[in-house]
C-alpha cells in the first residue's frame, strides 16, 4: 500500500502563504517591532482548564530518570520574560501545539503570531491589529462590541448579571439542554453559549473585536479598573472563526500566581492533572514587566480566510493525518 505522501496544499497556495507571511513580517519591521525566537518546549506550561498540552521527555546526560517537558501552547511566557529583561516591543511567528481538535479549522500543530507592544493598552492594540487584518484580509475596518453587548444583542441575556437558570434557558433555546443542564461552571456555560450562539452571528462582513470579558475569564489580563466585573481582554472573530485573543497584560506577580493556583485547584476538582506552574514567569513579573498589551493570532486561519479557503488543510503542507 502506497503512503499518501503529497502535500494537501497546492504549491501555488504555499507560494501565496509565503507572500502573506512576508507581508506580516514587513508590517512589524516598519513599526520597529523586534522579531524573536523562543523555545518550543518548557519545564512548565499553561494551567488553563480548557487547554491540553503535548508532553515529551528528555533523557540526556544528567537526566537518567527523564525530565518531563511540555510543547508550548503559546510563546507567551517566554516572551514576557524577554519583555521583563528590556526587549521592548517584540513579535514572533512560532509553532504552537495543542492536544485537542483536528478538523476544518484546527490542526494540533499550528503557526501562531504573537506580539507585545510596550506602552499600549488593549484598545491601542486592537487598533494595530485592525490595521494588520485590513492588510492581510483586504477587509474593511473591524466592528467592536463588549462581551456584554454581544450576548444582549444576539441572545438577549446578560452574561455578567444573568442567573445560571437564565443562561440554561438560552441554551435550551439553542438546543443545548443535554450539555447545559448538568453544567455547574458558569464560565464553561458562557463559553458554550458564546461559541454556539454568538460567534456565527458576528463579524460576517468585517472582523469583530469583542472586549471586556468577564473577570472570571481574565487569564493573564488585568481586571478593568473602572468595572471590576470585566477583564481587559479581547478576542477577534471573522466569518464564524476565532482568530485572536489579546490582553492588557497583568503585571502583578502575586495575582498571577494566585490565578495559576486557582486553575490547578479547579483542575483537581474536575479530575484533571494539575500543571507545573512557570515560576520563571512569576520571577520575571517580580522583576518588573513593563506596561504592555499582547495578542496571539492563528496564522493558518488568517491565511485560510485571506485566500478564500474553507479547510485549514488547503494552506497547510502536511496536516496532522499525514504528518
Curated annotation (Swiss-Prot):
Keywords: ATP-binding, Ligase, Nucleotide-binding
Record carries keyword Membrane: no
Metal-binding among keywords: no
Binding locations of ATP: 98-100, 107, 242-243, 298
Record field: catalytic activity: D-beta-lysine + L-lysyl-[protein] + ATP = N(6)-((3R)-3,6-diaminohexanoyl)-L-lysyl-[protein] + AMP + diphosphate + H(+)
A Pfam family it matches: tRNA-synt_2
Gene Ontology annotations for the cellular component aspect, listed alphabetically: cytosol
Disulfide bonds: none
The EC number(s) this enzyme carries: 6.3.2.-
Entry GO MF terms: acid-ammonia (or amide) ligase activity; ATP binding; lysine-tRNA ligase activity; tRNA binding
Positions annotated to bind substrate: 74-76, 116, 249
Gene Ontology biological process terms, A to Z: lysyl-tRNA aminoacylation
Function: With EpmB is involved in the beta-lysylation step of the post-translational modification of translation elongation factor P (EF-P). Catalyzes the ATP-dependent activation of (R)-beta-lysine produced by EpmB, forming a lysyl-adenylate, from which the beta-lysyl moiety is then transferred to the epsilon-amino group of a conserved specific lysine residue in EF-P.
Protein family membership: Belongs to the class-II aminoacyl-tRNA synthetase family. EpmA subfamily.
Subunit and partners: Homodimer.
Protein name as annotated: Elongation factor P--(R)-beta-lysine ligase
Top-level taxonomy: Bacteria, Pseudomonadati, Pseudomonadota, Gammaproteobacteria, Vibrionales
Amino acid at each position: 500500500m502506497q503512503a499518501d505522501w503529497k502535500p494537501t496544499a497546492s504549491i501555488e497556495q504555499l507560494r501565496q502563504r509565503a507572500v502573506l507571511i512576508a507581508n506580516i513580517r514587513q508590517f512589524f519591521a516598519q513599526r520597529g517591532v523586534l522579531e524573536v525566537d523562543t523555545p518550543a518546549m518548557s519545564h512548565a506550561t499553561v494551567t488553563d482548564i480548557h487547554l491540553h498540552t503535548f508532553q515529551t521527555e528528555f533523557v540526556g546526560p544528567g537526566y537518567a530518570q527523564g525530565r518531563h517537558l511540555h510543547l508550548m501552547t503559546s510563546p507567551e511566557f517566554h516572551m514576557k520574560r524577554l519583555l521583563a529583561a528590556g526587549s521592548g516591543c517584540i513579535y514572533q511567528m512560532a509553532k504552537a501545539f495543542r492536544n485537542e481538535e483536528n478538523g476544518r479549522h484546527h490542526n494540533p500543530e499550528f503557526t501562531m503570531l504573537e506580539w507585545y507592544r510596550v506602552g499600549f493598552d488593549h484598545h491601542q492594540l486592537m487598533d494595530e491589529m485592525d490595521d494588520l487584518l485590513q492588510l492581510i484580509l483586504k477587509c474593511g475596518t473591524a466592528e467592536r462590541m463588549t462581551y456584554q453587548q454581544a450576548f444582549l444583542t444576539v441572545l438577549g441575556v446578560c452574561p455578567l448579571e444573568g442567573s445560571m437558570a437564565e443562561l440554561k434557558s438560552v441554551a435550551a433555546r439553542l438546543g443545548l439542554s443535554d450539555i447545559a443542564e448538568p453544567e455547574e461552571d458558569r464560565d464553561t456555560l458562557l463559553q458554550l453559549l458564546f461559541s454556539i450562539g454568538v460567534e456565527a452571528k458576528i463579524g460576517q462582513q468585517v472582523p469583530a473585536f469583542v472586549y471586556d470579558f468577564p473577570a472570571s475569564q481574565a487569564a493573564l489580563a488585568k481586571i478593568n479598573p473602572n468595572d471590576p466585573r470585566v477583564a481587559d481582554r479581547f478576542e477577534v472573530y471573522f466569518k464564524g472563526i476565532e482568530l485572536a485573543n489579546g490582553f492588557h497584560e497583568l503585571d502583578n506577580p502575586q495575582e498571577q500566581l494566585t490565578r495559576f493556583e486557582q486553575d490547578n485547584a479547579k483542575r483537581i476538582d474536575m479530575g484533571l492533572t494539575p500543571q507545573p506552574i512557570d515560576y520563571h514567569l512569576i520571577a520575571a513579573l517580580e522583576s518588573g514587566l513593563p506596561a504592555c498589551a499582547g495578542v496571539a493570532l492563528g496564522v493558518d486561519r488568517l491565511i485560510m480566510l485571506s485566500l478564500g479557503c474553507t479547510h485549514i488543510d488547503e494552506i497547510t503542507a502536511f496536516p496532522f493525518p499525514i504528518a
